[in-house]
Design a protein with these regions (language model features):
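Metal- or metallocofactor-binding catalytic centers and their adjacent structured scaffolds
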Residues: 2-80
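Conserved, mostly hydrophobic/aromatic
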Residues: 4, 29, 69, 82, ...
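Ligand-binding pocket scaffold of soluble enzyme catalytic domains
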Residues: 8, 40, 80, 98, ...
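Glycine-rich beta-alpha junction loops
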Residues: 13, 142, 290-294
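Shared catalytic-loop signature of beta/alpha-barrel
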Residues: 24-27, 202-211, 217-294
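N-terminal amphipathic alpha-helix/helix-capping segment at the start of soluble metabolic enzymes
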Residues: 79, 83-97
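Metal-dependent enolase-superfamily TIM-barrel catalytic cores that perform enediolate-based chemistry
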Residues: 96, 101-220, 224-225
């Protein structure tokens, strides 16, 4: 700002493809708000949404750009009033947050060993639990037993018994290793399609998974199809943007846990509104993040 205050923000497009586009979007959007009062976060958010053309019904790049600027503006606001941002949002609900050890298929600890064989999954799970984690998240269908990544052709068709057993045997072994008191989140990264999600979900039920994350492409109708077939909580949100993107999932009851990423759903301004909507529909919230410590 012209008074010397500055804010930090971040676009959550650090993985996958698109970081260069997000950087360019931030630059373009920033030009629109030069000269505005940084404390007017609602006014600025609406300007970014309405005056850019592409934000309405927009996707990850435009909302990542909005998010980065919005987070920075809230940082400025907190510094200006000399209070934590959570105070400006209405106050904190708790002093501690439960955390889970995530993406154990890539390994865990200082010397990460990707999981190919069943014993690799078990070893990584045990490492995390030994550090005090009482919840772990694993994508059991990333690597085949030889260490190769599964192709989309292999994961988006009705699975033969062999591939079902590969996934479920890994899950079963991890459940046996960590016991009944550690929650297991079954991650999928939307690699599988709806039919495969139902196949795997039916088999996964007996292992009492906490939730089934991104079981298929983020699409309300496909999510509803999976949800109706399974009695397992479904989680989505890493790739859903703005309250307009979330509304269909709330309205049809196809999601039980949302995972909005503050760095790409529209920033703190929009994330608060998304979470308020979730509260109306008794949908749980677990903020997603896969970015820097910021």
């Amino acid at each position: 700002t012209d008074t010397g205050l500055y804010g930090d923000g971040e676009a959550a497009i650090a993985y996958g493809v698109g970081s260069t586009a997000a950087y360019g979007m931030i630059q373009d959007l920033a030009k629109l708000i030069i000269g505005m009062n940084p404390l007017d976060t609602e006014v600025i958010w609406e300007k970014l949404y309405k005056s850019t053309f592409w934000a309405q019904n927009g996707g990850p790049i435009v909302f990542a750009g909005i998010s980065a600027l919005d987070i920075a503006l809230w940082d400025i606001k907190g510094k200006y009033f000399n209070v934590p941002v959570y105070q400006l949002l209405g106050g904190k609900m708790r002093d501690k947050l439960r955390c889970y050890a995530s993406q154990l298929q890539f390994g865990w600890g200082e010397r990460k060993t990707p999981a190919y064989q069943i014993e690799d999954y078990v070893a990584n799970a045990k490492k995390a639990v030994s550090e005090g984690y009482d919840a772990i998240k694993i994508d059991f269908f990333t690597f085949d037993p030889k260490g190769y990544r599964y192709s989309s052709e292999e994961t988006t068709r009705v699975l033969d018994p062999y591939h079902v057993h590969v996934v479920i045997d890994r899950l079963a072994a991890v459940r046996e290793a960590v016991g009944p008191d550690v929650d297991i989140i079954m991650e999928n990264h939307s690699y599988i399609d709806a039919q495969v999600a139902v196949q795997l979900g039916e088999q996964a039920k007996k292992y009492n998974i906490l939730f089934f994350e991104e079981p298929t492409t983020p699409n309300p109708k496909m999510n509803k199809f999976v949800c109706d077939k399974l009695n397992i909580p479904i989680a989505q949100g890493e790739r859903i943007y703005s309250r307009w993107g979330y509304a269909p999932y709330f309205e049809d009851g196809s999601i039980q846990l949302i995972q909005p990423d503050i760095g790409n759903c529209g920033g703190l301004t929009e994330a608060k509104k998304i979470c308020d909507l979730a509260h109306i529909y008794d949908v749980g919230v677990q903020a997603h993040v896969c970015a820097s410590p910021l």
